[in-house]
């Protein structure tokens, strides 16, 4: 690939820094929260250290199973960078809400399906050994097929909106990269 040639390292570094928000992304362990961060985080109670200068990826959310990202806000953030960060945050919150609702609905309907099938068989919710009764894979396949069929339109709307949001984010990322490159070129011209 042409982008991986040794001569293009500077461009790769610049692009990587631009797309990651200035320096990188850190994976994080779950930490106790402060009151200051609990109010600002609607997605997770996880909070990165105050002095952090990177985006942090938190532990998976219990409802949505998605890992929330806590975006670093640089001191000299331009209006375009701020708009990009806000768009990414809005998209993350939208995504978290959709999957939390979807997973709740899925689990509720799955339990109802299992209960109704066990009742139809005349079996109880527990086996003779006291373990929770389950259905085999073929029986569960009926549920999965029905669930996907019932939610087909919802998933199509989600995918369409997801692609629109990602296109907008990618567009803003490109604008931010260009803005940063122009500002670096202007700095070089004024310093020479």
Curated annotation (Swiss-Prot):
N-terminal mitochondrial targeting sequence is cleaved from the mature protein once in the mitochondrion. In normal conditions, the cytoplasmic precursor protein is rapidly degraded by the ubiquitination-proteasome system (UPS). Oxidative stress induces protein stabilization and import into mitochondria where it protects COX from degradation. It comes from the Eukaryota. Expressed in atherosclerotic smooth muscle cells (at protein level). Expressed in aorta, brain, heart, kidney, liver, lung and spleen. Isoform 1 is strongly expressed in Kidney. Isoform 2 is strongly expressed in brain. Disruption phenotype: Mutant mice generated by CRISPR-Cas9-mediated gene editing are born at the expected Mendelian rate. They show impaired motor skills, with decreased motor coordination and endurance. Mutant show global COX deficiency with reduced enzymatic activity, low steady-state levels of structural subunits and defective assembly in all the tested tissues. Residues 1-26 form a transit peptide. It is found in: Mitochondrion inner membrane. The keyword Mitochondrion applies. One of its GO terms (cellular component) is matrix side of mitochondrial inner membrane. Induction: In conditions of increased oxidative stress, the protein is stabilized, increasing its mature intramitochondrial form and thereby protecting COX from oxidatively induced degradation. Its main location: mitochondrion. One of its GO terms (biological process) is mitochondrial cytochrome c oxidase assembly. It is a peripheral membrane protein. It holds the Pfam family COA8. Keywords: Apoptosis, Membrane, Mitochondrion, Mitochondrion inner membrane, Transit peptide, Ubl conjugation. Required for cytochrome c complex (COX) IV assembly and function Protects COX assembly from oxidation-induced degradation, COX being the terminal component of the mitochondrial respiratory chain. Belongs to the COA8 family. PANTHER family: APOPTOGENIC PROTEIN 1, MITOCHONDRIAL, CYTOCHROME C OXIDASE ASSEMBLY FACTOR 8. This is Cytochrome c oxidase assembly factor 8. It comes from Mus musculus. The gene is Coa8.
